[in-house]
Design a protein with these regions (language model features):
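Short hydrophobic segments within beta-strands
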Residues: 8, 31, 89-90
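Short, contiguous, pocket-lining structural segments
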Residues: 13, 40, 58
Length: 104
């Protein structure tokens, strides 16, 4: 029996997620009010990382897989995806996030 999924969003994350699910044998329905070239992904920069996600044992894994896919997409200039090092500044000292070791 086929696994069914609904992906909401036609931007980079939504489309990438839909492709991964299809490649894994899922039946995918994609819903979005806009598609390229009218998505936020087409005109805006994005900051991506697993944010306030749990359980860590699972989210670090999917975060790492997502990062790897986004990194692959940077090889094709037609995707418009570029990775840039960023810095976050906090008022108080923060410990490194659990997912930090899963990215380069």
């Amino acid at each position: 029996m086929a696994k069914n999924s609904l992906v909401i969003g036609g931007g980079v994350i939504g489309l990438s997620s839909a492709i991964c699910l299809l490649e894994d044998g899922w039946d995918v329905t994609l819903y979005s009010t806009e598609f390229s070239p009218n998505t936020t992904s087409d005109v805006a920069a994005a900051l991506w990382y697993p944010f306030l996600s749990a359980p860590v044992e699972k989210t670090d894994n999917w975060g790492s897989r997502t990062y790897d896919i986004l990194k692959l997409l940077t090889a094709d200039e037609n995707t418009g995806i570029d990775m840039t090092q960023t810095f976050e500044y906090f008022r108080n000292e923060q410990s490194d996030p659990t997912w930090m070791s899963t990215v380069d």
